[in-house]
């Protein structure tokens, strides 16, 4: 599997250390193993996980500004775990309301020796982000309106919201509440992934 990952990374123009590649493959192996009992993802094939979970997450890394991030509605750790592996100098809080997902993430943290993630079981509305985060990240979590409404208390004044989307959500962008603006929209190129991918970056006015 590490050879396929290396080939995908090369196609995407992403350079990682051998240790980072081993951690990413280790994460996929754990996800595949735990998925049988815990139903953590609808993707069953580890090779597909490399594309749809690993590559689809780490292509976002160059766009992230700051050192403290929170991944809301992280599920089994997406995109937070792959991002933590490829950016070891940053810290990622992984927030989910389901205990089985957080238990899985704590096992990932232990087995992969990831000291820059903190799994937390909580609803996002009830989680106090202190000190404020540099960035709030979500992937398949909610509409842009719901994201900024539910998570408005988490980023600092200069913090940003990073929403991973498929087709560009023009209706969601038009429905953003007052006080928030789209700072940037980046098409994301994910090798072997069909369909469009976009990163929408939102800042406060």
From Swiss-Prot:
| An annotated Gene Ontology molecular function | rRNA (guanine-N7-)-methyltransferase activity
Tell me its EC number(s), please: 2.1.1.170
Q: Which domain of life is it from?
A: Bacteria
Name residues in a coiled coil: none
Instruction: Tell me where it mainly resides.
Output: cytoplasm
Q: Which GO terms describe its cellular component?
A: cytosol
**Top-level enzyme category:** transferase
Q: Which InterPro entries match?
A: rRNA_ssu_MeTfrase_G, SAM-dependent_MTases_sf
- Spell out the SUPFAM superfamilies in the cross-references: S-adenosyl-L-methionine-dependent methyltransferases
Q: Where does S-adenosyl-L-methionine bind?
A: 73, 78, 124-125, 139
Per the entry, what this protein does is: Specifically methylates the N7 position of guanine in position 527 of 16S rRNA.
Name of the featured protein: Ribosomal RNA small subunit methyltransferase G
Upper classification of the organism = Bacteria, Pseudomonadati, Pseudomonadota, Gammaproteobacteria, Enterobacterales
């Amino acid at each position: 599997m590490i050879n396929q990952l290396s080939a995908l990374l090369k196609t995407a123009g992403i350079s990682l250390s051998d240790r980072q590649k081993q951690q990413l493959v280790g994460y996929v192996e754990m996800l595949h193993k735990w998925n049988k009992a815990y139903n953590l993802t609808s993707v069953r094939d580890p090779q597909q996980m490399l594309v749809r979970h690993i590559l689809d997450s780490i292509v976002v890394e160059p766009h992230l500004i700051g050192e403290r991030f929170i991944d809301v509605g992280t599920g089994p750790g997406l995109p937070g775990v792959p991002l933590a592996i490829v950016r070891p100098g940053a810290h990622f809080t992984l927030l989910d309301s389901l205990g089985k997902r957080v238990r899985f993430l704590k096992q990932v943290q232990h087995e992969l020796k990831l000291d820059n993630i903190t799994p937390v079981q909580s609803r996002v509305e009830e989680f106090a982000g202190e000190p404020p985060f540099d960035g709030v990240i979500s992937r398949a979590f909610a509409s842009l309106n719901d994201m900024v409404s539910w998570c408005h208390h988490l980023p600092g004044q200069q913090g940003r919201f990073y929403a991973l989307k498929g087709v560009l959500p023009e209706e969601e962008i038009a429905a953003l509440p007052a006080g928030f603006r789209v700072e940037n929209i980046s098409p994301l190129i994910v090798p072997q992934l069909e369909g469009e991918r976009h990163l929408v970056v939102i800042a406060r006015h």
